[in-house]
Amino acid sequence: MEVKTKQKSGKEHNMEKPELLSGNEKFCLNGIELGFTVRDYWQFQFSNLIDNLGYVAEFLVAKALAKDEPDNCNGWTLFDTQYRGKRIEVKATSYWQSWKEGHEISEQRTFSIRKTHVKYQDTDSKLERQNDIYIFCLDKGKNKESSNPLNLENWTFYVVPTEIINNLFGNQKTLSLNRLTKIEKYGIGITYDIIKETVDNIIDNKLSI
């Protein structure tokens, strides 16, 4: 069985969160500010949002939950964000990929639901899903023009308790979009503006099977 190992979260082993930058910070050489900034770096490396869809989805979910700072320090935490004491894992996919030729799209979309070990120093946990809630995010655009991550009308979100994933899919490593949409109650896609309400209802046991 393939096992993915992740470190404990920063909070669990007292890692300080990195300082949030404004984007106006300048690169320097020998104490002299150069003519380019962190914002320029972002434009150079990350402005192709469709190829960085996972990060965009994590950001959108965090903002929907009224969180201004990331919980996931450089990808080394057990989960992507934390809300009301619950660990939330965000997964994203899209029909259109920038590397696909022409107008070819991927109709069969899947999300990773792989179980992992927590390994930190001499501690090694059992193989399990290290979160309480999944939020699966789909960019519905099927070409370059319609696949715009900035337009939140293009997105559909599925909020599913990890307990449901465990009960229905056991040790499966991936979950297809088709199977996701057939999960009773939780397989109904929602819009961005009700993510927080849906998560609150799950935490408060107002949504259950």
Enumerate the language-model features and the residues they cover:
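Nucleic-acid endonuclease domains
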Residues: 1-86, 91-209
